Amino acid sequence: MHSRKQRGFRKLITQEKLQAILARLKSQEGVRGVVVTNMEGLPLSSDLDPETTENVAAIITSLVGKALDAVRELREGSLSFLTLDTTKGQINIAPDVSEGVILVVLKN
């Protein structure tokens, strides 16, 4: 008999808990948007308008894919976090490959 983990099952977070986490992130000073996407670029949750959400999800998913490849090629372990400093603020990206999700926080 295989354990649930061995068969590829993942512990799923409830929608209620996810919304509580997102609300807590959004309440932080300077946060202007939070997006959760899967590794294929499909938005799972967002507090941004639909067009911006889809744009962020697609672009960040592509960037994370490139970053994962770079880290693997450089033999630097595994990617845990990316920060992009921009003229408008900061984009914090936390990919979780084992769970198949990417958390994106846009800050002023």
Model-assigned labels for residue ranges:
Residues M1-N108:
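Non-catalytic interaction/Regulatory regions outside core domains
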